[in-house]
Structures are given as C-alpha cells and as structure tokens.
C-alpha cells in the first residue's frame, strides 16, 4: 500500500478518534448511547470542540479523497502525492490538537494547510503532471 493510502486509512480513523475524545470525561454526566447526538450537543469546552473537530474531519475526508483520486487519475508522480498526503495528515493532526486545545488561530492555519494540500492534489491531477 502506498503512503497516500496509509494516510487515507489514518484520515478515515480521525473522526472516530475525535468522537472518542468528545466522549471522555463529562463531569459525572455519563455518555448516553441511546441518544448520543443529543448528549454531544450538550457538551461544552474540549468535548464540544472535539465533537466539532469530528464533524470537520468527516468533511476533510471527502476533500482528501477527491484530491487523491484526481492526482492518481492525472498520473501525478507517486513521490509527490506521498509528500502532499503526509503534509495533509500532519496538518490534520495538528488541526485536531489545536481545536481540542482551543487554539483557534493556529487551528485555522492548520486547516488552510490541509486544504491547500487537497487543492494542490486536485490541481496537479487536472494538469496531468
């Protein structure tokens, strides 16, 4: 499996990890598996931010898939795809850490970096380089 596909594997797991972080703690309010979305909607602090990071991670997954598909279909060199994929993963991990830690400006910069990697993959695929 290529590095870019391992990054895809990690990217698929990121929303699940974020959901787990959102469900840890709670100050005595135990997780309600019968109504998980309502329970998560009442979270505050790091739990609410982790839940938001989960939602954004699902969105980023689609963006990465589009970029990866375009790059492979466009015949982009595997090494370049791998570099952009790894950069995307680093940006996304940093994004989640910043989101949960309430570092909003740094989080936005990480989001821009990750999105930029996806856009670059799509553009390179479209150019056929």
Model-predicted regions and their roles:
Residues 23-31, 75-76, 104, 127:
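Transmembrane helix-loop junctions in multipass membrane proteins, especially transporters and channels
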Residues 78, 121-129:
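Juxtamembrane boundary at the C-terminal end of a transmembrane helix
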Residues 1-21:
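Long, highly hydrophobic alpha-helical transmembrane signal-anchor segments
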Residues 14, 55-68:
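Core segments of transmembrane alpha-helices
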Residues 24-51:
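Cytosolic, membrane-interface loops and tails of multi-pass inner-membrane proteins
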Residues 10-13, 86-90, 109, 116:
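Hydrophobic residues within alpha-helical transmembrane segments
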Residues 93-116:
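Interfacial loop-to-transmembrane junctions
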Residues 78-88:
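Structural signature of hydrophobic alpha-helical transmembrane segments
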